[in-house]
Amino acid sequence: MKKYIVLLLFLLSGCSSPQLGTIQVNNINAYVELAVTPEQREQGLMYRQQLEKDQGLLMVFEKPQQVSLWMLNTLIPLDVGYFNKQGELLATTQMLPDGGKQLYHSPPETFYVLEMNRDWFNRYGLKPGAQLTLPESFKRH
């Protein structure tokens, strides 16, 4: 019996839930899940019925690159902000649920992608040049 408990604990230790934390864009707080693995980024916000007012997902990539996103199995409209490695907002786009028909492309130097509720960037007046600030626990990734 003890063997099975040890095995179960070992297997469960590999099942990590997403890291959560508060980030800021120009001192505006957002409570986000962190997506750093290809699997986490691919899952994104699929199947979510809603997000709270300042809740979202922050994707982090291994290196600056052009990122392509789609809305496959995403049920809610989103605002997406593309940031470079220094945390500067490069561009935003609005994405509507469409079953994954349209591809959205980021600027080539994208390192972070922030997915939030539709109109989040406009509501807070966040434009290109706004600054992303991460907690220390997120900077390890």
Residue map of PLM features:
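N-terminal hydrophobic targeting signals that begin at the initiator methionine
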Residues: 1-2, 16
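C-terminal motif of bacterial Sec signal peptides marking the signal peptidase cleavage site
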Residues: 12-14
